[in-house]
Amino acid sequence: NLMFSTEMGSTADGSMKIYLRPETAQGIFVNYLNVQKTGRMKVPFGIAQIGKAFRNEIVARQFIFRMREFEQMEMQFFVRPGEEMEWFKQWKATRLKWHQAMGLGNEKYRYHDHEKLAHYANAATDIEFEMPFGFKEVEGIHSRTNFDLSQHEKFSGKKIQYFDPELNQSYTPYVIETSIGVDRVFLSVMAGSYCEETLENGETRVVLKLPAALAPIKLAVLPLVKKDGLPEKAEEIMKMLRFDFRCQYDEKDSIGKRYRRQDAIGTPYCITAVSYTHLRAHETLANL
């Protein structure tokens, strides 16, 4: 059983057995008509959400790749019956482009089409990323047919069909689902950006080559030395930039060590405050 069970109630005798959700999707299905009506939406339309999910994994392993509690982003896209395969192909391509746009390298991604389908699906594929331990799923795209909505309708006894004004008829929509493990995407970014460089003296150092769009610190402002008015000039630069970029100011240790610290956290740009004297000295040495 993949679902975690627990009890709800103030006393043991009066408690009720409940289950933690293994996916976020079902909350969307039971509320889709409310969202459709209040948002005045027409098929095709999608509803997306992010939240916690829980699965009773027998073996939780590979760092944060497989956990019993994890963050999930899902979208349910409601379409007319008979049009689901066309939309499935479109979302399959769109979702791959989204992952590739992160800039980790297109060759690190691939599709894995399912040969054996779940009971609710008529098509399914995974987007896999090349982790240090092989290609692993980071997102699943599924054509769930109308199974979920039909089951909710059957067991609730309440009609939850959509009225299509263009066709002038009611029907149970088919659903294309995209499901992402947020922790897995984070792991793919870290794994795809982590590098170790070997120096001439045999030592190794870490460089986090994050794509600039994903880097938490966009730039660092560094005075070359802690004198000659350079810290004050660097702070002026910092004040000009901090409202537009997430910046970091650092004046401790040598300039080389400060560059190394920024390399280790994936900062794409560094601005170094130098004086005219330092520039002239550098130019003189370069010409020797």
Sequence positions of predicted segments:
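Single conserved hydrophobic/aromatic residue that forms the stacking wall/gate
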Residues: 278, 285-288
